[in-house]
Amino acid sequence: MRFSAFFAPTLKEAPKDATLKSHEYLIRGGYIQQVGSGIYNFLPLGKRVMDKIRQVVKEEMDQAGAQEVMLGFVTPAELWRNSGRFEKYGKELLRFKDRKENDFVLGPTHEEMVVELAKGYVKSYKQLPLHLYQIHLKFRDEIRPRFGLMRGREFVMKDGYSFHANEADLIREFELMEATYKRIFTRLGLDFRVVEADSGAIGGSGSKEFMVLAQSGEDTIAVCDSCEYAANIEAAKRRAKKVDSPAPIASFSKFKTPEVKSIEALAEFFKVDPFYTLKVVVKKAFFDGGKSELAFFFLRGCDSLQETKACNAIGANELLDVSEEELIKAGLEPGFIGPYALKNLTGANHILFDLELKDAQGLIAGANERDHHFVGVNLGEFEGLIYKDLAEVGEGDGCPLCEGRLTYKKGIEVGHIFQLGTRYSEPLGANFLNPEGKSQPLVMGCYGIGVSRLLAAVIEQHHDEKGCIWTKSTAPFNLVIVVSNVKDPSQKAYAENLYNALQKEGIEVLLDDRDERYGSKMADFELLGIPYAVIVGKGLIEGQVELVNRANLQKGIVLADDILGRILEL
């Protein structure tokens, strides 16, 4: 491709709303153009990178035995109602009516659509397993689209769906997809971690995320410093926390604690470690059908509530903070809420305790009475308490798998795999006949990769102050030939001959034959991030050209007659 005829409108200034380097460089480099909030056009350079990523994904998915399809972008709303996600997905699901007042949605994922497909054709265990995937456009009506391709409303995704006769075969496919995804992201040149994850609005049981490590990442992951354990903070577990100080010894009794409303004040008042205090976080929980009620989550005073864990524990769609006025209206004393008689006092359906509180002794808890707390609280004496993993893992907490410690890292989610089970097939009536001739729901898995997001993720991990640094498998071109002076016949002729020779060798090469200043051409090379540049300049008189490595901007002198062989070795 000749740069003089190539549509690559580069810009000197960064977009005003660009806070990430990927957003800035992809727009400045002419890879993408913003046309609306969270909506981007892919220009020729961006399309070339997208195609490179798409091809890697397709090759590995096909190798794993999956079959490519293309499902409708528009989905009948009735399918989403039947699966129970029409309300649960919230306002991010774009809903609309056609001219006949039929309800439709723009699919952010396609579980419902693919189940409907399988329902019509898969009738017997003999047709299983089956894995279908697509690389297609999606739409999610983000409330605050930001960070360029990282969090847009319109995006390209690889979404795959597998169907099985039993859980064992699903687990086999799940493990196969984990290995396949690892190969994909390794081929793309990414430093990534596989982490335990929450299933979110997709549902199902086991799930894992693939996180590209980058300080600009939106997700926080807990990583062990000694083993391979890693998990999204929303799903991270830890070794049970312990403290050096012994539990306070006190018989059960009520103490007057005037204006002692915070955990810090309570620990100071009784001269104990916050570990031995009982904290309650009260939230207003919202469920399907618009129903809402107060939910109570008890933890040790030194811990924080992980809201995603809490939301999942009670099956809520959303949790919101509760004001002191709302607590008082419910008959509670803010700052003094405890487990004793709480059910009778509030009629609450959701009173949960963190797993690490099971059989805890010597605790200090609110007495549900102003200016009073109980000491000597032993939770093992309570009956019918519900224990769930509620606490957020902190840096320095113990790894659940070894004696190591957990640290935080930032990551960009680029892939997510799920064990769905019968989460969709059962409500949508997708059944098959097993070997005994009995009807049962299809067992499912689903597997996603953010294809357009990967463009941004590569740059977030591979850039410098000058621009993009594409990896070998994602670069729009392998190499650019920079003609220092296009008015010099010898430079131009040599560049043309090298360009033709490289094309014959199957090298994707960009010939910068523009009548521009040398400095401008090099600035564009650095901005675009093509892996290598051959500079044809004054050194040609002495039979020399320069080879520049974009990753480190190191230059090397190469004999003009040897450059073709040198390039083929790269």
UniProtKB/Swiss-Prot annotation:
GO cellular component: cytosol
Record GO biological process: prolyl-tRNA aminoacylation
Coiled coil: none
Compartment(s) of residence: Cytoplasm
Protein name from the UniProt record: Proline--tRNA ligase
Subunit structure: Homodimer.
Gene that produces this protein: proS
Domain statement: Consists of three domains: the N-terminal catalytic domain, the editing domain and the C-terminal anticodon-binding domain.
Annotated keywords: Aminoacyl-tRNA synthetase, ATP-binding, Cytoplasm, Ligase, Nucleotide-binding, Protein biosynthesis
Organism ancestry: Bacteria, Pseudomonadati, Campylobacterota, Epsilonproteobacteria, Campylobacterales
EC identifiers of the protein: 6.1.1.15
Source taxon at top rank: Bacteria
GO molecular function: aminoacyl-tRNA deacylase activity; ATP binding; proline-tRNA ligase activity
Signal peptide: none
Family membership noted in the UniProt record: Belongs to the class-II aminoacyl-tRNA synthetase family. ProS type 1 subfamily.
Database matches in CDD domains: ProRS-INS, ProRS_anticodon_short, ProRS_core_prok
